[in-house]
A protein has these predicted regions:
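Transmembrane beta-strand segments of Gram-negative outer membrane beta-barrel proteins
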Residues: 25-37, 47-49, 53, 105-155, ...
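Structural signature for solvent-exposed beta-strand/loop edge elements and short helix-capping sites
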Residues: 47-63, 76, 83, 87-92, ...
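Surface-exposed loop and membrane-interface regions of Gram-negative outer-membrane beta-barrel proteins
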Residues: 149-151, 169-206, 228-232, 355-367
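Signature for the C-terminal beta-barrel architecture of outer-membrane proteins
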Residues: 214-216, 225, 236, 240-426, ...
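Outer-membrane beta-barrel "beta-signal"
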Residues: 275, 534-548
């Protein structure tokens, strides 16, 4: 432990010195609006997952026929500024220029309660009152989690402290419902009106972060997402609302390198490293590798330049009778061949038995399933004077064993325990870390939306989904092991067993009717056929207000 503390302390000192000596991003005035050139950038302050800024930078990149590298959320203001400043403003139309200036003002926040050369402090009050109804018990797990994550707390107090531009401490305190209480509506608002409905595990967002103009290091918790998709990322998806992590990143306008560790629950870790880079302005590639670990913390997996697979952690003995390591490998590709048009794809794999393995180890390899999945999509965004119009379609395939590994301890699954909850509800709930819809699935999704990003927006989405039984069997099984015991089980195809067919239509929108006062509403209906015949509804309407 003392070695770990010394390592982190040395890293903090190095980053501080590098930050002081590095050229400040805000001092490079190329492509920077005049009204933000004199405003220092708080390098280390985090921009949280699903913030509008990520959508703005993504749209501006599409408009300039460029791949967007700012798609790993959350991110520091320094990282976001690198990719915003890299946008070729001469290619932007009037709408793009306006959004570009808005994004810069947003990044160079000025309205701190306390601000001087070495310290900034800010605290705010956020309030939300929602009316809602949900047939949560009938819905897919992914939809339950999505609705919960999108519902704001009735009372929240975000707090941030910047100790110089290079060190940030932040937390998001809130009074809100727990997950199981939200599934019961109790009674049809977002307010926890009973003690059993109160979420006592706050804060779900908290961090300490240090950063300069080219690197950052963060220890914290919150939601995470990698890549702009409709059905959820195959690298790391935002389905889980509170994931503890530590992450080291290096960023440049043409490349982003990250090495991270995520804690799924005590003694369960996910180590990842990745590189996301541009081959040309309009072609981008992401290489992603990870390993799940059960047991003691292993420093070997923190090495960003090591091929994790070649450590062979699963071959080093069992922990409590269980294989201690699982694997994850991913490749992403994006092409922006024309203004506003993007083609993209993601591939994820946990296991794949090669011809060599099947020939030389036939008995063992016959019991190991090929667990893999992929998605591909097309997106087109067009700007109008007052807003943007976006159309996106996506196809997803996940075979029956994607993210289900030799035992549940190393499967790519995040677990949460609720100490306070309504009676007759489970103690815990789970969320897939990637592919939120789950394994054994084929899905097609289309979405059309209008967006001004900072003021109003609306979208209409349709999803058709076919899902086999293997994901449900995984959750329903007892014990720590759910894995093939016969070659027939290892070779099942999607959709396995008696399939489920789901048609889902959703519409939602928001409008900032007055400064800091926003109205939101949405409606969703899912029609189930196949092994279940039912209809599920989810609807909400609410008002949100921020003091500042």
């Amino acid at each position: 432990m003392s070695i770990m503390k010394k390592t982190i302390s040395a890293l903090l000192i190095c980053l501080m010195m590098a930050g002081i000596n590095a050229q400040q991003i805000s001092e490079s005035t190329e492509n920077v609006p005049e009204n933000t050139k004199t405003t220092p950038l708080q390098y280390a302050e985090l921009i949280q997952t699903d913030d509008a800024l990520f959508r703005v930078v993504h749209f501006l990149c599409l408009q300039t026929t460029s791949v967007c590298l700012a798609d790993k959320e959350p991110a520091t203001r320094a990282e976001a500024a690198i990719y915003l400043n890299a946008i070729k403003t001469e290619k932007l139309d009037a709408t793009g220029q306006r959004l570009y200036e808005q994004a810069h003002r947003y990044l160079h926040k000025q309205n701190y309660l306390l601000k001087n050369d070495y310290l900034t402090f800010d605290i705010n009050g956020e309030f939300a009152l929602y009316g809602q109804y949900s047939d949560a018990k009938k819905m897919l797990l992914a939809d339950q989690l999505s609705h919960y994550n999108k519902t704001p707390a009735p009372v929240a107090v975000p707090l941030t402290i910047n100790l110089s531009p290079y060190v940030n401490l932040a937390t998001y305190l809130e009074i809100k419902k727990g997950f199981w209480a939200s599934q019961l509506s109790l009674p049809f608002t977002n307010m926890p009106l009973k003690m059993e409905a109160l979420d006592v595990h706050i804060p779900h967002v908290a961090n300490i972060s240090i950063a300069n103009s080219f690197m950052s290091f963060t220890i914290g918790r919150g939601r995470h997402n990698i890549g702009q998709t409709l059905n959820g990322s195959l690298f790391l998806a935002n389905s889980t609302h509170s994931l503890d992590f530590a992450s080291l990143r290096f960023f440049h306008k043409s490349v982003n390198i990250a090495s991270s560790i995520y804690i799924m629950e005590r003694y369960r870790y996910l180590f990842t490293h990745e590189v996301h880079f541009k081959i040309t302005d309009y072609v981008g590639v992401r290489l992603f590798e990870g390993t799940t670990q059960y047991g003691s913390f292993d420093l070997r997996y923190l090495n960003p330049m090591m091929v994790i697979h070649n450590i062979y952690g699963w071959d080093e003995g069992k922990v409590n009778g269980l294989t201690p390591n699982g694997s994850q490998f991913g490749i992403g590709l994006e092409v922006v061949p024309y203004r506003g048009l993007r083609f993209y794809g993601q591939f994820e794999m946990n296991q794949f038995q090669t011809a060599y393995e099947r020939k030389n180890y036939p008995a063992e390899s016959a019991l190991i399933p090929n667990s893999l999945g992929g998605l591909c999509g097309i997106e087109y965004a067009h700007s109008f004077p007052a807003c943007t119009l976006t159309f996106q379609s996506e196809f997803l395939y996940a075979n029956p064993w994607l993210n289900i590994l030799e035992n549940k301890k190393i499967s790519l699954l995040d677990k949460h325990t609720e100490k306070v909850k309504p009676q007759n509800t489970p103690d815990e709930y789970a969320a897939w870390l990637t592919n939120p819809i789950g394994p054994d699935t084929i899905a097609f999704t289309s979405k059309i939306g209008v967006d001004s990003f900072f003021r109003y927006g609306a979208s209409l989405q349709y999803r058709f989904l076919v899902q086999g039984e293997n994901g449900e069997k995984f959750f329903a099984s007892s014990g720590d092991i759910y894995y093939p015991t016969t070659p027939d089980e290892a070779s099942i195809k999607t959709p396995s067993g008696n399939p489920l067919f789901v048609h889902t239509l959703s519409i939602e929108g928001f409008d900032e009717v007055y400064k800091n006062l926003t109205l939101r509403a949405g409606f969703e209906v899912s029609v189930f056929t196949g092994r279940k015949k039912q209809t599920a509804f989810h609807t909400y309407a609410g008002i949100e207000y921020k003091i500042r």
